[in-house]
Amino acid sequence: DISGYCQEGFGVFDRTVFKGQRWSASRAYLDPARGRENLTIVTRALVHRLNLSGNRVTGVLYRDRHGALVNAMARKEVLLSAGAVGSPHLLMLSGIGPKSHLEAMGIAVKADLPGVGQNLQDHPDFVLQFKCLQPVSLWPKTKPWAMIAAGLRWLVAGDGLCASNHFDAVACIRSEAGVEYPDLQLTISPIAVDENWSPLQEHAFQIHVGLMRAHSRGSIELRSDNPADPPRILANYLQDPRDRELMRKGIRWVRELVAQPAFSALKGVEIFPGAQCQSEAELDAKLNSHTSSQWHLSCTARMGPETDRLAVVDSDAKVHGVSGLRVVDASIMPFVTNGNTNAPTIMLAEKLSDTILGLSPLASMDLPVWKSPNHKNAQR
């Protein structure tokens, strides 16, 4: 179970799909509440900053779809849920963040929190591609007539090829003996695509290598004091040499996997990075040019005690140094989860919603993470 306590092994991805449609948190949680009298949803708006009176957050200033500036006042608290990029961006625009950086941007400092925008974590991703010897890949299904047929089936029945993202199979593995729980994730796709996500014009498949416990840390910084300017995102993928070593191990593990007899009828030549790419220098060159993101950005407003210099929120998600403000999204994770972040973020939000409402928590469960009995001596 990629989201459970026993993660190690091969399995099928859980997906938030309902009746053939991708089911976002908005559809699952917001749509059923749209009719509530105490809920107003404002779309196509850009929040400029949080309003503060002294050290208390009193509301938000935003520009609506017509270009008018609107002050929304809070009766109790403001909950910031703009994500691992948007939340630190808005905090800093509001004067909550690293003092030196805010002053350099000409922003008055309301709370000096050095950790805002720091500690950026993600799951770096690298793809290996192989020719498929059997005509079983999805390549023919990318032809116009096939896509029309798949679309019609989805419209009528809500199933078929259009009801999946086709990342069905996943493996969570330990890179070597001594590693307690998975630090690599392999995601298998029945089609290979180029850098622009256009399908290769042949039967092929690809396997993604994801670093689940990367050591490198990035940051989010302001580009200016203009809310419309996107922030600077420094991902810093593979900056730590340990991450390069782990990614190289992942590549070699994939090659070992597809060399097994079970793959012999399917696996053709390695398209990318190519079987000739073997040395550390050759692999590093490919990693430098082709490492990408699994879009699991997190940890830029991390939770921790006030004694932690880089902590931004406390255990109830309240922002240190100010009152009337909580951050509720993946930015408050201290460390990125060693699996996909969607389910953990929803779990985090559900837990904090109970905390905000003052509901009694469920009875705690002491369920330790499963470890292979021989993990100290064997990789598998």
Where are these regions (language model features)?
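Rossmann-like flavin
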Residues: D1-S24, H101-G115, N236, P241, ...
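FAD-dependent oxidoreductase catalytic-site/capping-region signature
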Residues: D1-S3, G11-D14, V136, G151-P344, ...
